[in-house]
Amino acid sequence: MSSFKKILGLSSKSHKKSKKMGLPPPYDESCPMETQPSAPLSNDFFGMEDMDLYDKDSLRYEKFRFMLKMTVRSNKPFRSYDDVTAAVSQWDNSYIGMVGKRPFYKIIAVIGSSHLQATPAVLADLNQPEYYATLTGRCFLPHRLGLIPPMFNVQETFRKPFNIGLYKGTLDFTFTVSDDESNEKVPHVWDYMNPKYQSQIQQEGLKFGLILSKKATGTWVLDQLSPFK
């Protein structure tokens, strides 16, 4: 039997797949897309028979729960919020995770960065400052991204280095985003932004690849994701 397995190229060690829905792939296994779609989506394609296809003018509202734990370690103290977002925006470089949740993670990362607090200097490792933030909440997001796939209650963790100008260090983020099917009223997601930086939402969001516009009512809408971030 063992020789038969060798002929077929089968390993004697089996890798069991998780039967739980919504679990992300292991982040140390890269599965790059070697080709990109070159034709418009059609209801004739497999699995799209009854799908409500993307319409850039269609405004949708997504209601969800979220949790974020964020730790940023830097070689030197940040001088401004602009420095903070320049570093934090690097968190999803070479992104491997749930694609449908990525826009929501980006928004939560922007909001989380506005709440970062430095640890006491005496606790800083080798005099290198550490910043942290923890957020939980329920909210809604107006967007024009088309149909969003179901978001299961699954935790994803990302650890990335950054090297921006004078600053270099590491980013450790843990996200949980899931659909909120309750009938309770919830605030707009940007209401969680630190009031001190509310006026910078559009500008800072762009660093994370978020293209935002404001409705006549003053509500922020996520129009699209930048292809350059």
From Swiss-Prot:
GO MF entries: structural constituent of virion
Q: What is the effect of changing residue 51 to R?
A: Complete loss of cytopathicity
Q: Name one GO cellular component term.
A: viral envelope
Signal peptide interval: none
**Pfam families to which the protein is assigned, alphabetical:** Vesiculo_matrix
Any coiled-coil regions, as ranges: none
Quaternary data: Homomultimer. Interacts with viral nucleocapsid; this interaction contributes to the virion assembly. Interacts with the viral envelope glycoprotein; this interaction contributes to the virion assembly. Interacts with host RAE1-NUP98 complex. Interacts with host NEDD4 and TSG101. Interacts with host dynamin. Interacts with host NDUFAF4; the interaction inhibits viral propagation and is independent of interferon activation. Interacts with host GTF2H5; the interaction may inhibit host transcription.
Family to which this protein belongs = Belongs to the vesiculoviruses matrix protein family.
Q: Which protein are we looking at?
A: Matrix protein
Species the sequence originates in: Vesicular stomatitis New Jersey virus (strain Ogden subtype Concan) (VSNJV)
Q: What is the lineage of its organism?
A: Viruses, Riboviria, Orthornavirae, Negarnaviricota, Haploviricotina
The encoding gene is M
